Amino acid sequence: MATELPYDLTPELAPLSWLIGSWEGQGRLGDGSADTEIFYQRVDFTELGLPFVEYRAESWLCEADGTLLRPLTVESGFWQVDRERRDGDVGPGMRPADIVPAFRSAEDVERLRAGDEGFGLTATIAHPGSLSELYYGRIKGPQLQLATEAILRGSAAGPYHRATRMAGLVNGQLFWRWDVADAAGAELEAHASAILDRMPSAAEGRLAPGAERPRGAGGRKQGEQS
């Protein structure tokens, strides 16, 4: 089904429009085998009227039936089409952008497309424990791939050397996977993966994490069939 774009959507967000909104569901740590721990996750991609989306993901360890056990972690950041800086961009810091936006139409944004490879994508993600990541990758239709370009670790950070992430929209559900290498020279290993359903946003009166939802309202549990 074609994505319907709001008339007032910032043009540069067109390639990311399928992500915008709230998502919830369950996943597993590690390689996803039956003996790995299950988590419940709520993800928000929020449009702010600027050429990037705000990202926030909250996760809780949970039982297979969705009962929350305890908080797991939170990560947040910003995702945007990768391009060179222009006068129409805000920042650094509180420096205001030029009143004329860098890209004023979808046709302008199309010039950033790299043919069949889609658009460049960059994401900055911050974690608890003094760890931040800078990712670069590609977004092509409802699929994306990212790999770390740089990682900032403070004294509270544990081993974490590089990572890749991928996500895609399949039958209206958001599938994602995250692979991590803890040390230089180490191979990437499965870190976590999940399948999320689109859910009402906070403004639309969404329920508390893990709350029982009417049948057909999303939030499929591990092991349930579509």
UniProtKB/Swiss-Prot annotation:
<feature type="region of interest" description="Disordered">
    <location>
        <begin position="201"/>
        <end position="226"/>
    </location>
</feature>
<comment type="similarity">
    <text>Belongs to the nitrobindin family.</text>
</comment>
<keyword id="KW-0349">Heme</keyword>
<dbReference type="GO" id="GO:0062213">
    <property type="term" value="F:peroxynitrite isomerase activity"/>
</dbReference>
<keyword id="KW-0479">Metal-binding</keyword>
<dbReference type="GO" id="GO:0046872">
    <property type="term" value="F:metal ion binding"/>
</dbReference>
<protein>
    <recommendedName>
        <fullName>Peroxynitrite isomerase</fullName>
        <ecNumber>5.99.-.-</ecNumber>
    </recommendedName>
</protein>
<comment type="pathway">
    <text>Nitrogen metabolism.</text>
</comment>
<dbReference type="InterPro" id="IPR022939">
    <property type="entry name" value="Nb(III)_bact/plant"/>
</dbReference>
<keyword id="KW-0413">Isomerase</keyword>
<feature type="binding site" description="axial binding residue">
    <location>
        <position position="191"/>
    </location>
    <ligand>
        <name>heme b</name>
    </ligand>
</feature>
<comment type="subunit">
    <text>Homodimer.</text>
</comment>
<dbReference type="InterPro" id="IPR045165">
    <property type="entry name" value="Nitrobindin"/>
</dbReference>
<comment type="function">
    <text>Heme-binding protein able to scavenge peroxynitrite and to protect free L-tyrosine against peroxynitrite-mediated nitration, by acting as a peroxynitrite isomerase that converts peroxynitrite to nitrate. Therefore, this protein likely plays a role in peroxynitrite sensing and in the detoxification of reactive nitrogen and oxygen species (RNS and ROS, respectively). Is able to bind nitric oxide (NO) in vitro, but may act as a sensor of peroxynitrite levels in vivo.</text>
</comment>
<dbReference type="InterPro" id="IPR012674">
    <property type="entry name" value="Calycin"/>
</dbReference>
<dbReference type="GO" id="GO:0020037">
    <property type="term" value="F:heme binding"/>
</dbReference>
<keyword id="KW-0408">Iron</keyword>
<feature type="short sequence motif" description="GXWXGXG">
    <location>
        <begin position="21"/>
        <end position="27"/>
    </location>
</feature>
<dbReference type="Pfam" id="PF08768">
    <property type="entry name" value="THAP4_heme-bd"/>
</dbReference>
<dbReference type="InterPro" id="IPR014878">
    <property type="entry name" value="THAP4-like_heme-bd"/>
</dbReference>
